[in-house]
Amino acid sequence: MLKKLLFLFLYLAASCFLYGQQFQISSVDYEILPISPKSHFKTDDYQIAKEIPVNTKKVFSSEEDLFKYLDDYRQKLKNLRAFEEETIEINYEYSEPVTTSTLNNQGQPLTITFVTLHIKAQDAHHLVIIPGPKYNSNSGLTLKIKLKDTNFLGTLQTLRSDFYVMIPTSESDADNFETGINFAYDYPFQLGIFDALWINDLGISYTSGNNLPEFGISTGLRLELPFEKTKLIFEATQSFANNLGFQKYNDTFYFTDTFKISAPIVLADLNYFGKLNYTPYFNSTFYWDFNGINKNNISLASPIITGGHSLSFGRKDWNKNLRTGLSVSLDNYYSYNFKTKIFSPVVKLDTQAYKSFDLFDNKYTLNSFGICANLNTFTYLTKPSDDPFTLQHQGIGIGGQLRGIRDTQYYEGTGMSALSPTSAIILNLDFPIHILSTYFTKTFLKYLNFDMQLSPFIDIALCYNKITKEYFNPKDGFYAAGLEAIVYLHRWSSTAIRGSVGIDVGRKFFPNMLNMEWRDGVSKKEFSLGLELHY
């Protein structure tokens, strides 16, 4: 009997102690293993902490809440797609509990146990050097040797470089051979109190029949000054280009100077969906050359100033190479061109939603499927029909968002692009289905393990039509559908090989239901092959 009473006393004492005990993360250390012992680089601790910071200010009311936070943080590490998923570990150590003078709701002293986190992971393979053939119905067949490093020098920044030869085909809109090389990489570093980013982008190409190559070289600096609830971002870039398309204006060689300033402000913490950010910003762009930009060259008319603000939040979780999550961005900006005297107020809404589902308990085939939706809408707040310049020259290109709709379409008998409207609603729907996974174990074959998905898709766009002067008339819309095959390499988790075939189903199958008078007679199908997802 005495033992039972003693046990009950100890149990109640421990319960009271734990009830008043809370937890707070005090420090974090990272142990990131390189891809191999011979590798000289691994993911930098500072870049991880910057990309997904650990909350060291939050006090967790229970051990259960702490564990939920750690599980969520592990998922965020997976979402980086930078590490071998099975190697991600989060271990922890408790300090001796510290009793504070603060009382909880029950009038008991608040006891805090400080927690030290030990995060361990191994870098996934992130360097890809492969032939990257790409077929696009708009430009033709591109034979490419592509270098892509999604975690170059351990900075969590992507380096892209390629050498290509573009060959026109009977299906393509291009007529001449083209060869070129491209390089782009932004290098992060600390500059005093600033988080800095050195911006670099270079491209040079030669098209048969031209006397000179075309090129564009851009470099700049981005500085971030972080505060508790906001940060100031300054960015300045300069580029030098040779564009033979401006030869008739004697503006072939020209410079572009840009300056941007923004200040993302955290309005609220939306828990799973992260921070709700409000971002006011200001941009300026100025084109110039040594003999002055030709006044008739509308494409280089400047200076242009833009002021705006945006609201955004979002998160997407990866599981079995499928996504679950939601992201929303609402943007409103006002742009003025001092050369053309054109004022352009614009509102944009971009929304992406993903959901994955489990199918059969079989790791080899048909174990999951997903639903993906991408909704982009925008509108100029001025009436295009009242301004001939806006009608002829203004708009936002949407061709790249529509698989199956040729990018180079013009209103019949005009030089106006049918895919650069001033208002549009674009919807992409994808339904990826897991088809096959391989699990080879031999030394060489294990590097070829992959997951394969097939994804039917539907792309729809309703726009302001510059010929009929109507908004979002379904008869003036673009309707496409098709199929994508997507391959994810297990050892290169951040790389997706995607092949797509799309058909302009509106023009091909339902021409009697559409306004055909203004439509250009281009091909009704579009193919593409590349190394990234559509969205």
Where are the regions that the model predicts?
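C-terminal outer-membrane beta-barrel translocator/porin domains of Gram-negative envelope proteins
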Residues: 278-460, 464-474, 499, 509-535
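Transmembrane beta-barrel wall of Gram-negative outer-membrane proteins
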Residues: 174-296
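Periplasmic polypeptide-binding modules associated with outer-membrane biogenesis and secretion
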Residues: 21-138, 146, 160-189, 203-207, ...
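Repeated loop/turn-to-beta-strand initiation elements of outer-membrane beta-barrel proteins
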Residues: 126-129, 152-160, 190-199, 226-235, ...
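Outer-membrane beta-barrel translocator/channel fold
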Residues: 169-176, 192, 201-215, 236-257, ...
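Transmembrane beta-strand segments that form the barrel wall of outer-membrane beta-barrel proteins
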Residues: 125-137, 143-145, 149, 156-173, ...
